[in-house]
Amino acid sequence: MVVDTAVYTAHTAFAALWAGSVLFVGVAVHPLAMAGDIAPAAYGRIVSTLRRVTRASALFLFLSGGHMAATGYTVESLTGSSTGHLVLTMLGLWLALAATVEAGSARALRGVEQRKIREPARDARPFLRAAAVVAVALLVVAGLLGRPPAGL
């Protein structure tokens, strides 16, 4: 029970860090890059940090989520219940978030290495916007998974 609580807490903390990082970069930092109001080196460091957070979180969430799924679900409950469907939806959204952040950060960093800012930001824009939308969707699904059962 203590291990499960610790895993759940760490899983939630990493998920919050990842989703929050994606939203911060997408909403606060990326518009500055689009306007040319941030130095390419600073933008590159921020995007590199987002990429590291994404990779670490994706790995940790895969492991901790796998533990939670293995101890709390069966194949039948994952595929045959609304809660199981939410868990599978979350897995798909995590994969989409990792992919969009990786694609966006690769495009941003490619141009930043050439000391450019507006063009790489423009190239990364659709991916970072999609990542922000996916991060919000993940928070919604997490809220639905965390709701108390009906009747409580």
PLM regions: where:
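Polytopic transmembrane helical bundles with strong interfacial aromatic enrichment
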Residues: 1-152
